[in-house]
UniProtKB/Swiss-Prot annotation:
Assembly mode: Part of the apolipoprotein B mRNA editing complex with APOBEC1. Interacts with TNPO2; TNPO2 may be responsible for transport of A1CF into the nucleus. Interacts with SYNCRIP. Interacts with CELF2/CUGBP2. Interacts with RBM47.
Modification Phosphothreonine occurs at: 498
Transmembrane segments annotated in the record for this chain: none
Gene expressing this chain: A1cf
Keyword tRNA processing: no
Full protein name: APOBEC1 complementation factor
């Protein structure tokens, strides 16, 4: 097979060689192919300054596979000066359907997105163009909750290079502990990519704990003109007990009567001001101040325009979500509970307005930990580009508001959702994607049970990776793959737990994936509202014909197989060191056969 690593002028033996040589001769740019991509320029002739700043690169998707630089370069040249173009190539000499173009400044990049998105490059072939995100931030899960920021920063510098900063958020319930994960900022995308490769499961442990590593969700930038009119503050790291009245009093202390209203949800809040000047003054005065025993972080909330809304909307929501088309201006709110996951905080003027089809009870109710109007953060890339490559999937078309997550006493008018699971059929294309974490309400569900069992047995935090596929009725379906860090580190060849069915709802897919993982591990999920975590080994004596004398006694794989033969509940054995390997290598569903 031909190597995908080429060097030289990048033209010899290529398709449209004559046209490409004519392009290079006309512009004076270099054209070199290496590591599966063909690079045009970078830098261009006569460029004697530093490379363009971050935000100057765009992603161009939906390219016809037989389209090359001789067609794309002239199109981009009309918009601005090209610093560099990188076209992804396959072994056959065709492009992979996408390319990256870096312009000399941000304004040219913005103009290119506006002019080229949905541009008809050929008859019936429309381009998909969005901003490219040069991601320099990694998500690292499985960190002991007792570790401080300085300790995490020091440890990350020991195991990876190019670490610039570490972002750690305190637990909502206990501010002396972290949330079990951190965001690590690197000096460049390359440094972050090298660190991600080094930190893959099984290679590195932190403080003796297996870790989970992935790209952090890239932050969407809001233009300066839009931010200059914002008069709403986002306040995080509040105590759960801190009231809206207490927040309003604190912010009004800077200028009495400046606050219009406060909306607090869990450990964060939005503070609305009558004018921007008062908001900025309060932000400068109160950012970092201790309120009710907790140092708070105060920033300007980020609004989203119509284009950004459409780009992020896929018409999917959480449990009991209804999709409704609206004729008034499009806008939405990102669920701020995910801001600690790296997602931006957005607000909208309609955020706290009642939607016409919502029926509010006579008695006073409350909002749950989700916003009135929200949509999952979906990072799907054109042409199945791997996660973290660039940009967000531009969907175009009409926008919809996906509203969900209302607390007790609120009802959504419409047909009752029919829960249904769909078979994972051969040939279905599963696309990696991220989403807002949906927190179960009221009862303890399978994801909570799985997390508690993993914590109890020091297996690390379960990592959920969301995939989607299009069903036979053209409906978007969802499936989560689950990775347990301890199992992955002990058995690098083992694939993530993959359930056999997809769901039309994201939260249902996550619940089913957790249930499937528990079942694969031999842990029952029935009656799981309390005490469903893995029992200690001392409870093993309740199983007839098999008793484990103490928690320190070794348990062999043969003994566990005997327990399976006797039909015993394996949950009693999950605390033993041999159990993870036994469970994965002996159970079905693609992980082995009994």
């Amino acid at each position: 097979m031909e190597s995908n690593h080429k060097s030289g002028d990048g033209l010899s033996g290529t398709q449209k060689e004559a046209a490409l040589r004519a392009l290079v001769q006309r512009t004076g740019y270099s054209l070199v192919q290496e590591n599966g991509q063909r690079k045009y320029g970078g830098p261009p002739p006569g460029w004697d300054t530093t490379p363009p700043e971050r935000g100057c690169e765009i992603f161009i998707g939906k390219l016809p596979r037989d389209l090359f630089e001789d067609e794309l370069i002239p199109l981009c040249e009309k918009i601005g000066k090209i610093y560099e173009m990188r076209m992804m190539m396959d072994f056959n000499g065709n492009n992979r359907g996408y390319a990256f173009v870096t312009f000399s400044n941000k304004q040219e990049a913005k103009n290119a997105i506006k002019q080229l998105n949905n541009y008809e490059i050929r008859n019936g072939r429309l381009l998909g163009v969005c901003a490219s995100v040069d991601n320099c931030r990694l998500f690292v899960g499985g960190i002991p909750k007792t570790k401080k920021r300085e300790e995490i920063l020091s440890e990350m510098k020991k195991v990876t290079e190019g670490v610039v900063d570490v972002i750690v958020y305190p637990s909502a319930a206990d501010k002396t502990k972290n949330r079990g994960f951190a965001f690590v900022e690197y000096e460049s995308h390359r440094a972050a990519a090298m660190a991600r490769r080094r930190l893959l499961p099984g290679r590195i442990q932190l403080w003796g704990h297996p870790i989970a590593v992935d790209w952090a969700e890239p932050e969407v930038e809001v233009d300066e003109d839009t931010m200059s009119s914002v008069k709403i503050l986002y306040v995080r790291n509040l105590m759960l007990s801190t009231s809206e009245e207490m927040i309003e009093k604190e912010f009004n202390s800077i200028k009495p009567g400046a606050v219009e209203r406060v909306k607090k949800i869990r450990d964060y809040a939005f503070v609305h001001f009558s004018n921007r000047e008062d908001a900025v003054e309060a932000m400068k005065a109160l950012n970092g101040k201790v309120l009710d025993g907790s140092p708070i972080e105060v920033t300007l909330a980020k609004p989203v325009d119509k284009d950004s809304y459409v780009r992020y909307t896929r018409g999917t929501g959480g449990r009991n979500t209804m999709l409704q088309e609206y004729t008034y201006p499009l806008s939405h709110v990102y669920d701020p509970t995910t801001t600690y996951l790296g997602a931006p905080v957005f607000y909208t003027p309609q955020a706290y307005a009642a939607i016409p089809s919502l029926h509010f009870p006579a008695t006073k109710g409350h909002l749950s930990n989700r916003a009135l109007i929200r949509t999952p953060s979906v990072r799907e890339i054109y042409m199945n580009v791997p996660v973290g490559a660039a940009g967000v999937r531009g969907l175009g078309g009409r926008g919809y508001l996906a509203y969900t997550g209302l607390g007790r006493g609120y009802q959504v008018k419409g047909d009752k959702r029919q829960d249904k699971l769909y078979d994972l059929l051969p040939g279905m294309e599963l696309t990696p994607m991220n989403t807002i974490s949906l927190k179960p309400q009221g009862v303890k569900l399978a994801p909570q049970i799985l997390e508690e069992i993993c914590q109890k047995n020091n297996w690390g935090q379960p990592v959920y990776q969301l995939h989607s596929a299009i069903g036979q009725d053209q409906r978007q379906l969802f499936l989560y793959k689950v990775t347990i860090p301890a199992l992955a580190s002990q058995n690098p060849a083992i694939h993530p737990f993959t359930p056999p069915k997809l769901s039309a709802y994201v939260d249902e897919a996550k619940r089913y994936a957790a249930e499937h993982t528990l079942q694969t591990l031999g842990i029952p999920t029935e009656g799981g509202d309390a005490g469903t975590t893995a029992p200690t080994a001392t409870s093993a004596t309740v199983f007839p014909g098999y008793a484990v004398p103490s928690a320190t006694a070794p348990v062999s794989t043969a003994q566990l197989k005997q327990a399976v033969t006797l039909g015993q509940d394996l949950a009693a054995y999950t605390t033993y060191e041999v159990y993870p390997t036994f469970a994965v290598t002996t159970r079905g569903d693609g992980y082995g056969t009994f």
